[in-house]
């Protein structure tokens, strides 16, 4: 298995950046398109555990104003072969002292391209 296949890495890096832009713009249609539309998709958020694409989409519709604005740092994207990638990043939100963390597992589907199959967003405790 090739780690960080150049073409796959370029594709997923672009997809990750497009996801972040859609998140900051609260573009619900685009955000839905980034997730695998399956009951097996999972998203653990800061205050919610969402099982299945429908639950994730419903959460976004009900979220007033969308995601708090943030700045990313320490982003890492690693491809495992040409069809699996893990993206991790830290983020900083305005008026929040805790550092945010996000991890996403992306799979490239033959008919749909890259989709998030699992995501986790959390805020680090001030002390561990």
Regions found by a protein language model. Give the residues of each.
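Short, low-complexity N-terminal intrinsically disordered segments enriched in polar/charged residues
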Residues: 1-37, 126-128
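Hydrophobic alpha-helical segments typical of transmembrane helices
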Residues: 15, 27-30, 59-60, 73, ...
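Hydrophobic pocket/interface hotspot
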Residues: 19, 31-32, 52, 56, ...
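Short beta-strand segments enriched in hydrophobic/aromatic residues
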Residues: 35-36, 91-93, 120-123
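Surface-exposed, charged secondary-structure patches
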Residues: 46, 54-99
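Short beta-strand edge/turn micro-motifs at domain boundaries
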Residues: 86, 99-128
């Amino acid at each position: 298995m090739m780690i960080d296949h150049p073409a796959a890495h370029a594709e997923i890096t672009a997809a990750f950046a497009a996801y972040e832009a859609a998140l900051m713009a609260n573009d619900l249609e685009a955000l839905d398109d980034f997730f695998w539309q399956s009951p097996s998709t999972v998203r653990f958020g800061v205050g919610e555990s969402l099982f299945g694409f429908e639950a994730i989409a419903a959460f976004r519709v009900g979220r007033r104003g969308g995601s708090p604005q943030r700045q990313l740092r320490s982003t890492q994207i690693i491809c495992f072969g040409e069809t699996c990638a893990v993206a991790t990043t830290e983020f900083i939100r305005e008026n929040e002292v805790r550092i945010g963390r996000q991890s996403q597992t992306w799979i490239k589907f033959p008919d749909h391209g890259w989709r998030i199959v699992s995501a986790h967003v959390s805020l680090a405790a001030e002390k561990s």
